Amino acid sequence: MKMKKIASVVSAGVMAMGIGASLAPASVAFADSPYCGTVEKAAPENGFFFDFAKKMPQETQASHGWCNVDMFDTIWYKDNVTFNSKRMQLHLDVEDGPGWSIPGINYSGAEFRTFNQNRYHYGLYEVCMKPAKSDGIVSSFFTYTGPYDEPKTQWDEIDIEFLGKDTAKVQFNYYVDSKGGHEYLYDLGFDASEDFHVYAFDWEPDAITWYVDGKEVHKAVGNLPVTPSMVMANLWAGKGVDEWLNPVDDSDFPVQAEYKWMKYTPSEKADK
């Protein structure tokens, strides 16, 4: 989700558009139910299935006490990641951290991520989610690796992003060695903030293919990410990107994005 340079924070004792179009459907196996019904599937070898009815998976964590610089008007706050009603909620609110304040940062958001040492490579990444709807914000599901997390690598990233200003569309994007500019907006034909749907991307050496409810909707080829990555989701408010997101309207805050499950099925070409 456009992970740029990270600014660590210590305060009050707390440490914190694309290539290609729709082609013939690829041969990939999706989780049951395009609308996020009960999915009883064990994680495949070297993959995972995170069922948020079962709270925070052991392989994951919530970011806390720091913020991304540049376009992020948000500090990550671990208590903004909650588990209720058999779902994970990521919350975004006017900054209300536990006694700390960061000059120039107005909002507290949420970020869910796998541990730094848990890296995932080629394969099918799926999420059952419902994004937040409000001007100036982003809800996401993505893979990321870069120079700001140990072990340090080049910045590679693959994104599924919902711009809160128009949740009838989803944005796909990717970065290769810090170079982005591959944004592609897909018109869903429905308001994603009103119900759960399955969004996915199949990452292979020669292509990234994005899906909505099992339907192929976009493909990128050419110079693509190659580096095993963490899996992440976040909800944040932007700044200085009004043309992209619209100005933040916090009159309806707090807002939340919800997730029922995430799944990764490794490709035969993935690093083990």
Question: Where do the language-model regions lie?
Answer:
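Sec-dependent signal peptide cleavage junction
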Residues: I19-P34
